[in-house]
């Protein structure tokens, strides 16, 4: 028998052993991508809080990667911004140096988005080519890539809403959609990473697994409501706690003052802030009850420790949110609150995903 005939027999076992090894590189890459998304959200938050989001008035996915490099190019970009309602209403008289600062924030946000795209698709192609991704994982990653491309389009739609006549900021519902989609992509990355070659634990009771799955869903809802708070600047109103204008729940007549009534959920700052408060209370209660239940049902287990850590992080986020409100959203507090929300989501997703891998 020739060596050529023996070669497939020797390669096959090696390939099987390689396929069965923990996909450490893939997992690390996914967690790195998740960290980059958190950085993207943080820079986006800073861009919003510094009023920089409308400084670039065009969407050029390729050529826009290069910032203005000459005095003439800067003058051209500044002229475009001076034609916007935001400049005319809020920033009339802004100097070129001041414009360059806000431009840098928005350009940095978009550049980071491009960098994330490269860091995602290039390794994805390599991992798939080298056989490190099974079909299910690969399709999940392609789906996340599609969402990432969609996120760029949603970002521009959001910016374009703030360039319309009479507008000085982006539409709250579009800002919330942009933030929620980024958070969903982050959650998807963590879900896939946490599910790669994790040692399975003993199965927790079904109720614990269900509440663990409910926690990231509730967190994502709370992030969406936070996006509405940010977009409508509701955090600059009712800067007291636990009462809002002297009441735990303001009068219904004020909460639903606009018509049609559905618009109040987006445009009425009182209802927008109240919804964010109420879901925060519900999320905190759910996290605490889940931690207590896990400690009682599986004392000393990994699930109990993760549930306790998650409850502690949710409590810290609630206190940070109250502080941010009482201080009327200073830059540092607003950014910390937004980033911590992502950490809560990431921990909730990882906790839920590991729970699904438990042995029955």
UniProtKB/Swiss-Prot annotation:
Pfam families assigned to the protein according to its UniProt record, in alphabetical order: COX15-CtaA
Top EC class of this enzyme: oxidoreductase
UniProt xrefs under InterPro entries: COX15/CtaA_fam, HemeA_Synthase_type2
The UniProt record lists the keyword Glycoprotein: no
Cofactor(s) demanded: heme b
A GO-annotated cellular component: plasma membrane
Transmembrane feature ranges: 29-49, 111-131, 139-159, 175-195, 210-230, 269-289, 309-329, 330-350
The EC number(s) this enzyme carries: 1.17.99.9
Subcellular location field: Cell membrane
Residues annotated for heme binding in this entry: 276, 337
Catalytic activity: Fe(II)-heme o + 2 A + H2O = Fe(II)-heme a + 2 AH2
Mode of membrane association: Multi-pass membrane protein
Keyword terms of this UniProt record: Cell membrane, Heme biosynthesis, Iron, Membrane, Metal-binding, Oxidoreductase, Transmembrane, Transmembrane helix
A Gene Ontology biological process term: heme A biosynthetic process
Biological or metabolic pathway of the protein: Porphyrin-containing compound metabolism; heme A biosynthesis; heme A from heme O: step 1/1
Molecular function GO labels: metal ion binding; oxidoreductase activity, acting on NAD(P)H, heme protein as acceptor
The protein's assembly and partners: Interacts with CtaB.
Function according to Swiss-Prot or TrEMBL: Catalyzes the conversion of heme O to heme A by two successive hydroxylations of the methyl group at C8. The first hydroxylation forms heme I, the second hydroxylation results in an unstable dihydroxymethyl group, which spontaneously dehydrates, resulting in the formyl group of heme A.
Family (UniProt): Belongs to the COX15/CtaA family. Type 2 subfamily.
HAMAP family: HemeA_synth_type2
Protein name according to UniProt: Heme A synthase
Organism: Methylobacterium sp. (strain 4-46)
Chain's gene name: ctaA
